[in-house]
Amino acid sequence: MKVIRAKSAGFCWGVERAIQVAREEARGGVRRVYTDGPLIHNKQMMDALSREDIREVGDYQSKQDLDLPENKDKEAVVVVRAHGISPQRRKYLKELGLPFRDGTCPDVGIIAGKVKLHAEKGFAVVIFGDPEHPEVIGLMGYANGQGHVVSNEADLLALPAFEGKVAMVSQSTMFTHEFQKLSGMLAEKYPDLAVFDTICGATKERQSDLLELVKSGADAIVVIGGKHSANTKKLAKLSASHNRPTYHVETADDLDEESFS
């Protein structure tokens, strides 16, 4: 059996950066680090980080109060997840009185900046993404009540009529072709639509590499990554949409060897 490894396999640079931030603050386990929800959507890495005293204390969407011990170490550090958070959440975390580090992926920070800027200018801001994903929840916090999330064509058609200017961005881990389709539809209704393709380069690269594997005639595709990761779930969906047997696994133990015999 021949195994072909995609060129872009592995964590993206934004995830690597968040891990680095947490580890810098942990100082090899000398100082405790609390993360507001999962730092990244990869259980195995989060388990590894927990052994370095980097502990997840928030919920998946970073909405609930942190479950900190009553005798929390005042030298501990709170680290923001790679997916980013809303301004309101940021204020809450800083008010905890603990040192604070931001692990937000810079690409997500750029999207938040575009949402904030255009909302302040009076634009209605349409965000293409999953309304339940922590990245989108964080972005909506910058929209000043003028944000609208769409995840498909039906959502787009259900949008209210906008009287003023409209801008559109995307969650960083969405399908490029779907964003192009929906932004094109919205531009037909609002010719002056300000469109920002904010799908990150790593996402595009991985989707492109997967399609290359499909075109090369691969008989099956194995996508390795967290079951809650938007990136890996999208890759598995993309592979399956091209009628390839697709296996989304987190570890080698998840592989069924008989499926490849």
State what each model feature region is.
Residues M1-S261:
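The feature marks the mature, well-folded catalytic cores of soluble enzymes
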